[in-house]
Amino acid sequence: MANLRKTHPLLKIANDALVDLPAPSNISVWWNFGSLLGLCLATQILTGLFLAMHYTSDISTAFSSVCHICRDVSYGWLIRNIHANGASFFFICIYMHIARGLYYGSYLYKETWNIGVVLLLLTMMTAFVGYVLPWGQMSFWGATVITNLLSAVPYVGGALVQWIWGGFSVDNATLTRFFAFHFLFPFVIAAATVLHLLFLHETGSNNPAGINSDADKISFHPYFSYKDLLGFVAMLLGLTSLALFAPNLLGDPDNFTPANPLVTPPHIKPEWYFLFAYAILRSIPNKLGGVLALLFSILVLMVVPILHTSKQRGLTFRPLTQFLFWALVADMLILTWIGGMPVEHPFIIIGQVASVIYFTIFLVLSPLAGWAEIKALQWA
């Protein structure tokens, strides 16, 4: 009699994705981040669900309801701290996952990669609307500043902003709809994740050598299920440590003050994981130009597969492009630092130079380096 997991219509799907999935034998720890993202998503949905049971999306009670969750609800403080810091870990894992994709040429699986970029955009939208919900000062002013960017859209900008707001300013209608979006988007992300996996399993995983691994595959379970489990333990250890020992480390002190439309905080800035994009936005002294640069700072990932000029897939044996990759990592860190700084000298010029370098590496230097490496191999 055949094994039930191989014959049952539902179990067969799970089996092909998690148990009998043929995986390259040489994939490293960098391939752990996909499953870690799944864990992050599950954690966020679960903690978010419990928070939603006690939260009220009304401007007169939102801030108080968050205080109530932390003070009166059983383990509410823990659920909130895990949810707030879980978002940070989510983005750490996303950026690591994307970095691995860029380093090892995983972007050549175009459908998987493009759905991944869509997933990144969805996650960023979810995090943004979620940050507005506690209705603190930075929540309110962050919502005002970022939604106002839509007014840069020619002709329909003003109407678009009022449509998003549900009025003439960020008000009760805005908070209510943002809560609705924040509840809905994680399930959209989960659905897109299924598509992401569907397309990945059409081709199979890439590997550090960047070559076809059909001749040397091993089953996902038990080898990589246990390897992923180690990653789970490491991440959950980090998350719980942060949530228990330094829950407000990554937050903004301004968000402990209830939203006040009459008082603008001295420095309006988003959470740390958006600072690189915020720095790119601020580095262009034109509203529409800044918004386009902000959008393209993420959408540039979609053109990476088109601009792949090398005959080798990954960067394992390509020292020139390796240098560019690490220059990009350093540049992202500089942009993140600048995004949190006030708009004054020397931060303005540093941000502008870093923004130019960011786009130059993606659009000019990487394709050139790939081409140069091919030439060098031909001459060798």
Swiss-Prot record:
GO terms for cellular component: mitochondrial inner membrane; respiratory chain complex III. It is found in: Mitochondrion inner membrane. InterPro entries: Cyt_b/b6_C (IPR005798), Cyt_b/b6_C_sf (IPR036150), Cyt_b/b6_N (IPR005797), Cytb/b6-like_sf (IPR027387), Cytochrome_b (IPR030689), Cytochrome_b_C_euk/bac (IPR048260), Cytochrome_b_N_euk/bac (IPR048259), Di-haem_cyt_TM (IPR016174). Keywords: Electron transport, Heme, Iron, Membrane, Metal-binding, Mitochondrion, Mitochondrion inner membrane, Respiratory chain, Transmembrane, Transmembrane helix, Transport, Ubiquinone. Its main location: mitochondrion. Pfam families: Cytochrom_B_C, Cytochrome_B. A ubiquinone binds at H201. Heme b b562 binds at H83, H182. Heme b b566 binds at H97, H196. Its cofactor is heme b. It is a multi-pass membrane protein. Component of the ubiquinol-cytochrome c reductase complex (complex III or cytochrome b-c1 complex) that is part of the mitochondrial respiratory chain. The b-c1 complex mediates electron transfer from ubiquinol to cytochrome c. Contributes to the generation of a proton gradient across the mitochondrial membrane that is then used for ATP synthesis. Belongs to the cytochrome b family. The cytochrome bc1 complex contains 3 respiratory subunits (MT-CYB, CYC1 and UQCRFS1), 2 core proteins (UQCRC1 and UQCRC2) and probably 6 low-molecular weight proteins. This is Cytochrome b. It comes from Oncorhynchus mykiss (Rainbow trout). The lineage of its organism: Eukaryota, Metazoa, Chordata, Craniata, Vertebrata. The gene is mt-cyb.
